[in-house]
Amino acid sequence: MRFFARYEADLLEKKVRRQIADQVHPKMVLYYNSGDRDYSDAAKAITAAIGAFTRASLQFTFCVTGDGWNEGAATSERWGRYRKWRTANGENRRLYDAPWHQFEHHESEQLSKVVEFALQLGWDAIVCAEPGRQLLLLSHDDRIEIYRGFEWRRLAEKLIAFGYWPR
């Protein structure tokens, strides 16, 4: 697993945003009610929907409550779990300073964990994977947009079974 600095993440995000521009509308948009609950099943379903990836990434782009290092989040149990996970994986920079999480093919459990954190903490995040230029967006507005790949029909069925709904 690697964490990319802000300037590297910005370059990678521009590349991904161009891919989004190629496909104006997502293939599927799902909604959910956020809150302090268990997102592990949804995160595992999203990760499994990628299939056999060579490289997968999640980029934090925004969160209403900040990046977990501000004063308001300092006492948050959920943000504390994320900071502890991040430190345990060798990253001590703030999330704003190193927002891009990259995973190799054997790190699907770690990818699933960071997707779970993104859902739980209400991030705007880009999830992408290779091969196949797979692309999914998570939104703090309780929305998941599937643009490309992710076995999107099957993933939608699983997420709907977990209480998510289409628009």
PLM regions and their residue ranges:
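Structured alpha/beta or helical-core interaction and ligand-binding surfaces enriched in interleaved
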Residues: M1-R167
